[in-house]
Regions:
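Extended catalytic core of nucleotide-activated donor transferases of GT-like folds
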Residues: 1-104, 110-116, 232-238
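N-terminal pre-catalytic "stem/leader" segment of glycosyltransferase-like enzymes
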Residues: 1-60, 164-208, 307, 326-329, ...
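Donor nucleotide-activated moiety binding/catalytic core segment of transferases
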Residues: 35-38, 205-269
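Short acidic-hydrophobic, aromatic-tinged amphipathic segments that line or gate anion-handling sites
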Residues: 28-38, 227-234, 286-294, 301
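Hydrophobic transmembrane helix bundles of membrane-integrated enzymes that assemble
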Residues: 2, 86-89, 98, 158-159, ...
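Conserved catalytic-core segment of nucleotide-activated headgroup transferases in glycan assembly
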Residues: 5, 114, 118, 122-232
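A short, active-site helix/loop in glycosyltransferases that binds the activated sugar's phosphate group
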Residues: 83-84, 88-152, 326-337
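Catalytic binding pocket for nucleotide-activated donors in carbohydrate/polymer assembly enzymes
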Residues: 246-324
Length: 343
C-alpha cells in the first residue's frame, strides 16, 4: 500500500537472512534493513510505524532526530491480552509495550475500544475524537495465495467425504472459541438433520475437547459428539484446510475480533462462511453475537443453497475486497492523513 502511495517502505528486521530460500516469495522484493544499517546511512524518514513488538529505543531516537513521527499501531486485542496474560501465563514476558517517545497511537477498527487504554498506557494524550486514532483495515489476497502462486477455490460436494463443516477458531481465548459454532451445528443437527453423516472438523480442538470440563459437562449432552461426528485436528493454516477440505462449509464466531481476515479469505475463495461480523453482515451468511438459533438457520441456508448462490457470493466478495483494498484511493487517503496528522 505504501509503495502504491509513493513512499519507500522499509521493513526493519533484527538480522538479515543468509539466503532468501526461507523468505516467502512475496517478501523477497521488500526493502529490509537492520537498525545498524539505518543508523549508518541516514535516510529521510516520514514515520516509523511499530506493529506488534516494540522497536529498539535507539532507532526511535534516531528517527526523531531525522524529523520523523513515531506511531504505534496495535492490531491486537491489547486490553484483553494484558489482562489474560498474567492470569493464564504468569511466566510469559514479551515486549508488547515499551513506553518512550511515541507521538501517536493507532488501532485497527475492530479494536477501537482499546484506543484510549493504549494512549494512556503509552503516555500519549488521546484526541477528543477517538475515531481519529482508527487506522483503516486493509487486506489483499496476495498473502493467502502466496503472491498469486496458488488459487484455492471452493467446489460443490460431489462425494460423501466432501460433506464437512470446519470450525477454525484456535481456542486460545474467549475471543476465538469453538463453543458457539458447536452449539449452532448441534441446533441444526437436532432441527431435522439427524440423518446427516458428514464430519465436524474442529481445528486445534484438543485444547477444548481434552479438558475434563468439556468431557464431563458439555460433550455428553451434544448429539453431534455422542454420534461420533466431531473430529479434532491440530492447528492448521487456512490454505492447508482449504486444500484438504475443498468443499467445506465454515462456522465462525469471534468476540471483539470483528475484522477477522479469515472471513475475507474464505469469501474471496468462494467458501461458505457463517460468521458474526456485524460490519460485514451483508456479506456471506451472517448472524449476530451469540445467537445460536440464527446461526443454525444461516448454516442451513449455506448448506442447502450455496452452490446456487456461488456466482453472486463471489461478486459480493469482490466488492468487500475492494472496500478494504490497499489500492483503494479512499483507504490510501485515510492512511496518508494519519501519517501526516491531518484531519
Amino acid at each position: 500500500m505504501f509503495d502504491a502511495m509513493g513512499y519507500a517502505p522499509i521493513l526493519v528486521i533484527n538480522e538479515k537472512p543468509e539466503t532468501l530460500d526461507s523468505v516467502p516469495s512475496m517478501m523477497c522484493a521488500a526493502r529490509m534493513m537492520t537498525t545498524d544499517e539505518i543508523i549508518r546511512q541516514p535516510l529521510p524518514v516520514v514515520a516509523l510505524i511499530e506493529i506488534g513488538m516494540s522497536i529498539d529505543p535507539l532507532l526511535r531516537q534516531f528517527v526523531k532526530m531525522l524529523g520523523g513521527r513515531l506511531a504505534k499501531l496495535y492490531l491486537g486485542n491489547i486490553l484483553n491480552i494484558d489482562i489474560e496474560t498474567p492470569i493464564f501465563y504468569p511466566g510469559m514476558f514479551f515486549t508488547h509495550h515499551v513506553i518512550e517517545k511515541i507521538d501517536t497511537i493507532w488501532v485497527s477498527p475492530h479494536y477501537g475500544q482499546h484506543a484510549e487504554y493504549a494512549s494512556f498506557l503509552n503516555h500519549v494524550t488521546p484526541p477528543s475524537d477517538l475515531t481519529r486514532m482508527i487506522a483503516p483495515y486493509v487486506w489483499d489476497p496476495c498473502f493467502l495465495t502466496r503472491d498469486f502462486t496458488e488459487f484455492p477455490r471452493w467446489k460443490p460436494r460431489a462425494a460423501p467425504e466432501d460433506d464437512v463443516i470446519v470450525i477454525m477458531e484456535p481456542n486460545i481465548s474467549f475471543q476465538k472459541c469453538c463453543f458457539v459454532p458447536l452449539m449452532a451445528i448441534e441446533r441444526w443437527y437436532r432441527n431435522g438433520n439427524r440423518s446427516w453423516k458428514g464430519k465436524v472438523i474442529v481445528v486445534n480442538g484438543d485444547r477444548v475437547t481434552d479438558t475434563t470440563h468439556f468431557k464431563n459437562t458439555i460433550a455428553p449432552y451434544l448429539d453431534i459428539c455422542k454420534d461420533g461426528l466431531v473430529t479434532c485436528k491440530d492447528r492448521m493454516d487456512i490454505l492447508s484446510v482449504m486444500k484438504e477440505y475443498p468443499s467445506a462449509l465454515f462456522m465462525m464466531h469471534q468476540v471483539n475480533n470483528e475484522y477477522n481476515y479469515m472471513t475475507m479469505e474464505l469469501m474471496w475463495c468462494g467458501f461458505p462462511a457463517v460468521h458474526n461480523t456485524d460490519a460485514w453482515a451483508q456479506f456471506g451468511y451472517s448472524y449476530t453475537g451469540n445467537n445460536i438459533d440464527l446461526a443454525a438457520k444461516q448454516l442451513e441456508i449455506a448448506y442447502s443453497g450455496h452452490t446456487n448462490r456461488l456466482e453472486a457470493y463471489k461478486a459480493n466478495a469482490n466488492i468487500l475486497t475492494w472496500q478494504h483494498s490497499p489500492y483503494n484511493p479512499a483507504n490510501q487517503l485515510a492512511w496518508d492523513n494519519l501519517i501526516h496528522a491531518r484531519g
